[in-house]
Amino acid sequence: MELHVQLKHSTDCFVSLPPKIVHSLLLLSEKQSKSLGTLGLEITWYDKINKKENKGYVGWAGGSTDPRFTDSIEMSQEMAQCLGGIKNEQKLKLKALNNIELAHSVQVEPLTSDDWEIMEVHQQYLEEQLLNQVNILYSGQIVPIWIHHKTIIKLKVTETLPTPVVKLSSNSEIIVAPKPRNLPTTTTSSQQQQISKETLKPRFLQIKDFKIDYNNNNTFINEIYINKELLNQFQWNIGDIIEISKVSKNNNKNNKKEKNNNGGDEEEDDDDNEEFDDDDDDDNNNNEDDTSKLQKQLDNKNNNNKKNKKNNKTIYARVFINDKSNNQQVLIHRNIRTIGNFYINTIVRLKYTTSHSLPICPIGSILVKQVIWKQNSLSNLIKQQSSQKIYSVEQIKEQIKVWSNNNLSNNQRYPLLNGSIVSINSNLDLSFNFNNLTSSIIPPTSSSSSSPSNNLDSQRSNNNNNNINNDQLNDITNNMNNPYLSSIQQIGDIMSNLNTNNNQNNQNNNSNKLMNQFQMNNGIFMLSLEILSNDKLLKIESGGNNSIEKKKSLEDYNEIGDRLFQRIGGMEKQIKQAKEFLSLYMYKDLSVIREQLNTPGVNGMIIAGSHGSGKSLLATSLGGYYSTDSRSNAFIIKLDCNQLKELKVENIRKQFNKLFYKSCKESGNTLSATTSTNTTPPPIIIILESLDLILGTPNDQDPGSKIRCEQLVSHIKSLCFKYQNRSSPIVMIATVISSQSLCQSIQIPELFGLTIELQAPTREERVEILERYLKYQGKQLKDQQSLNLMKFSASMEGYLGCDVEQIVDRSIHLSSIKEIENNNNNNDDNDDDNIIEFSIIEKAKEGYTPITLKGIKLHSSEIKWQDIGGLDSVRAMLKETIEWPTKYPKLFQSSPLRLRSGILLYGPTGCGKTLLASAIAGECGLNFISVKGPELLNKYIGSSEQGVRDVFSRASSAKPCVLFFDEFDSIAPRRGHDNSGVTDRVVNQFLTQLDGVEGLTGVYVLAATSRPDLIDPALLRPGRLDKSLYCNIPEFNERLDILTCLKSKMNLSPSISLEQLSTNTQYYTGADLRALMYNAQLKSIHEWMNHLEEEKKRKRKEKEDQSNKNSSQQQDDFIIFQPKNNDNSISKSNLTFEEKTNLQKQIDTIKSQFINSNTSTLNKSNLSNEQPPLITQSHIDLALKESSPSISESERKKYERIYNNFLKERGSVTGNKKEGVPKQTLA
C-alpha cells in the first residue's frame, strides 16, 4: 500500500492512519472478538539524495488522520527526521507486521552527553511516560523522547532481544549505557597540545612472539614492545597505554574519517561487520517476502556482531622499547595473544589511547587462579617440557607478594582486562578476574560522589616513575575521579526508576548484572601494589580444579618452527623440492623477481600419499618453517576438509569464503593503500587437509558428484583469483591420498603447480627414520655401532614412517616398564634412562601390524628353498625376478629397464608349482596374498571385476607383495568362449590391472596353471605375465634331490638306497614321491604301534598271573573304625551284611584305580623311552607296491602335446629341459 506522509507537530513516535483504514481495522477486530491494541508497521521510501531505498519501523496506537487526507499518514517532524530525513508529501510504502516479538531487553545509549544529563534528571518521568510515546523499536534506530512535552532527547537503540524488531511492554527491560561528558584534566593546556594527529593515528604492525628472560628476573604483566625508531616515529612515550585490536574492513573507512577529523578525538572502530559475500545465496532467497528477508538479514547481523565482539576483544597494554623487533613488528607475549586471539605474523591495529577515553572500572574484588597451559594439536607434534608445578594457595599468595613488591613499586599501574594473564615466574602464570563475585560488586548509589570515587582516591599517586611517562600516569590517576566511574554506578539507579518500584530487590540485582557485564566486556582495571596488598580485595580459590584455570594456547605455527624437520626422516628429496617451489612465493625479497616473471599471486602444491606416509607432518613442517623464516614470516591457516565432507555445497562454499577472507584480513591484505601501515602484508599458506574428501574424482554412475565437484572447483578458483596478491601471495598446500583420488579439474598449474608423491620408505630411509625419531625422543641405542640396523630394517619391508615411530614409542614404553621392574626388584642397574637396548625394539616389533596391512589377510609359510627338490632353473629364475630386487634395491633402481613383475608357472599337477609359491612367501620377506581362481567369479554383473580390483588394491596397500593366483586358467580363459561373458570381463579387468601406465611398483604377480593353452594370450604378452616357467615331471636326479629333501624330515634306515628308489619311481611327480614316503612312514608307524600293543598285552598278562598268585596266598584284611558318640561311649551296633558288601566294593574300586594309574604312568614312561618308528626297506617296498604315478602315460603325452604347442606359440623354451620337447628359438 502506498501513502503520502503528512508531517505534523506531536509529542510521540506513533503514526496516524487514514480513517478508512482505521475503520477496516476496527471491523476486523470486532469480527475476531479481539482487542486491536497497537500495530507495527514497516515503511519503505526512496531517498533521492543518496539514491537508495530505506526501511524503517513505526507503531500505530489508534490515531487517524485529518479526513481531508484520505491517502496519507501523519507523523511528527522529529520522528521523520530520526527515521532518515523523510520529507513532507513523500511517498511511502506501508506494510502491516502481525507477529512482532515482545521485547525482553533493549540496550540504548543517549545520542549526546546533554541527552544523558537530561535523562538523569528526569528518571521518574521516563519510567511513567516511555510507553505512551513509543512502542516499536529496532536495532540501529534513533528515537526522539519528549520530556514534559517540551524538551526532546534522542536515544540510539544498540541491541534488541530476542529479535531485531521488537514491541515494548511493561515487562521489557531497558538498559541505558552512560554518555558522560569528558572533563578537562589538569594538563589540558599543556599535554593535550602535545597529542598531535600523528600520535592519534592507528598503526598496523606484524605480531612477533615476545619471550621473557626469566634468568634476569624479568616477569610479564601487560606490555608490548617496539623498537625506539618506531616509538619516535609514532610520537609515543614509554609507558603509554595502547589499544590493540584486530584488523577489519572498517579500518579503511575509519582511517579516512580520522584523516578528516580536525578534533582531538578519533573515531571509534567498529570491528563487528565481518561479512562473507556469497552471491549465490541471494539468488536462493528471491521467493521470500520482504519481511522475512529483512528479519533474516538483521538476525545474521546481530549474531555476527555478538560473535565478533567475543572473538575480537580489545586489549590495552603499555608500550616499551625492545631492539629485537624491526620497523615492521610489534612483540606481543603469549598471555596477551591468547586473550585477544592474536596470531603470530598477523597484522594488528595499534592506537594511542588518551587518558580521558579509557573505560577504567573500580575494583571491587580480584579472583586469582593459577593458569595451566594445555597442549594443542601443534604442540603435541614437538617435544614438550615437564609438566607445570601446581602451587598451593599459600604459595601463590607468597609469590604474589614477592612479585608485587619487586615489579609494582614506584606506584606503577598496569591496565588489565577480566581474564588477563600475568607471568609471575617461569613456572607460575596467574589469571586475574575482577568483580566477578556478586557479593563483591560495589553496590549502586544515588550520589555521584559516593564511595567509588572515594575508594579510587586511595589509588592516586604523585610520585615519579622512572619507566612510565609521568604526565601520562598523572592523567590516568586524576581522571579516575571523573563522573565516568560514578555514572557506571548510577546505571542501577536509572534502571530502577525505569521499572516498577514494587520489585526493588530484583532491580538491584539487575543493576549488579549490568555493571558486571560492562566490566567483563569493556572495562579495564588498573592494577597496583596498593590494591594487591589489600587482603579484602584479593581472593584465591582453593581446593581441586577450582583454583586452576586451564587454557589452551593458540595454534601458532611459529611454535613449531623448523624443529619438525629434525624429526622427519627419509624425505630430504621431497623437502628440498617443496622448498624450491615455495620459496619463490614466500620470500619477500623475491617480490621483484615475481614481478619480472609475471608470477601469479596464488599457487599451491599437492602432497599425495597413503595414510601414515607423513603428508600432514610434511605440510605442518613447511608451515612452521616459513612462519619463522625472517625472509617470509608467513601467516599459516589450516582447514580440515574431513569436517566438511557431510555438508552441502552452499555450506562448504561459505566455509571457504570465511577461510580466504580471514586469512587475508589477519595478514592485512584487506587494508587499503591509504591506510597508515609500516609493514608489508606477509604471504599466506593455506593448508587444506584431506582435500580429496570434498573434491574427489567424480563417479561416472553418480552425475550429482560431478556437478558438486564442478561447483566447488569453480568457487575455489574464483576465490583464489579474487584474493591473489603478487606482493603477498597465497599458497595452498593440499594433502590427498593420491593424485588420482583428487578431482582433475582443480589440478591445474594456475592453482597447484607441484605434486609430491610420498612412497613407502626404502630400507635406508627406515633406518634414518628410526635414528631420527629416537634422537627426537631423547633416546639412543645401546652399542649402536655394533648393531646391524639394515638387517632389522629389511624385516620391516612395507612399513611406513608412522609404523617405525609407533615401534619406537612401544619400545620406550617397554623400556620404562623394565626400568620400573628393576627398581622394584632393587637391581643395581645404573644404565642411563635415555639408553634403549636393541632387544627391546625387536620385542616391540613382535605382534605389530603395519597400517598398510591392517584388515588384509596374508599367507604365511615356513617352507624354505632347501625344502624343495629339483626345479633348480625355476628357483633361480624366481630368485632373480622377485628376491634380488628386494635384496639389492639400489642396483635395480639404477637400471633403466622396467622390472619384470609377472610370472606364469605351468606344468602337470603335482610338480611343485604351489610349493614354489609357498617358498617365495617364506624366503623373500615379502607379503604374500594367495587367491584361488574360483573365489573371484560371481554371477552378478560387475562383482567379478570388482573382486579383481579389490585384490590388486589390497596388494598395492601391502607392497612389497606377491600376489599368487592358483588355477589361473579357471578365471582367465580365452575370451569369446563363455556364453555368460563373466570371464571375458574378468580378463579385461586383469589386462587393465597388469598393464597400467603407472605399472605395478612393488607388486609381483605369480600365476600357476596346468593348462596354459586355455589362458587368454593377451595376458601372456610382454609387460604382463611375460615370463613362463615350466615345472616338469622330475627326472632321475631331480627325483633323487626330492627324496633327499624328504629324508631330512623322516627317520630312514641307513640301508635304504635312495638311488634305487629314484630309479624305481620313474614318471613319479614330486607330490607322488611325497605320498610314497608318507605311506611308508605310516606303515612303519603301524608296525611300531602293533609291536607296542603286543608288548603291553604280554606285560598285562604277567601282572595278572602274579596278582592271582598273590591273592591265593593271602587275603586282604580291613579294619572298620567306629568313632565315639557324644557321651564318649563307643557305638556297639554292628554292620549288616549288605553294608559290609558295599564297603568291600568301594575298597576294590579304589585298589583297581590305583593299579591302573600306576600302569598308565609306566606305559607313558616306556613310550617316552621308545625310539621313533624307523622306516626300513620293507616299508618302502610295500608302499611302492601299492602306489603308481598319478599321471598316466596318455595324460603325459597329452600334456607334452599341449606344452609343445604352447611353446611354439610363445616362441621360446622356459623352465626345465625335457627329452622329446623340441627347443624353440626366437629366429
Swiss-Prot record:
Residues 264-289 have a biased composition (Acidic residues). One of its GO terms (cellular component) is cytosol. Residues 290-299, 1096-1107 have a biased composition (Basic and acidic residues). It is found in: Cytoplasm, Cytosol; Peroxisome membrane. ATP binds at residues 609-616, 907-914. Interacts with PEX6; forming the PEX1-PEX6 AAA ATPase complex, which is composed of a heterohexamer formed by a trimer of PEX1-PEX6 dimers. This is Peroxisomal ATPase PEX1.
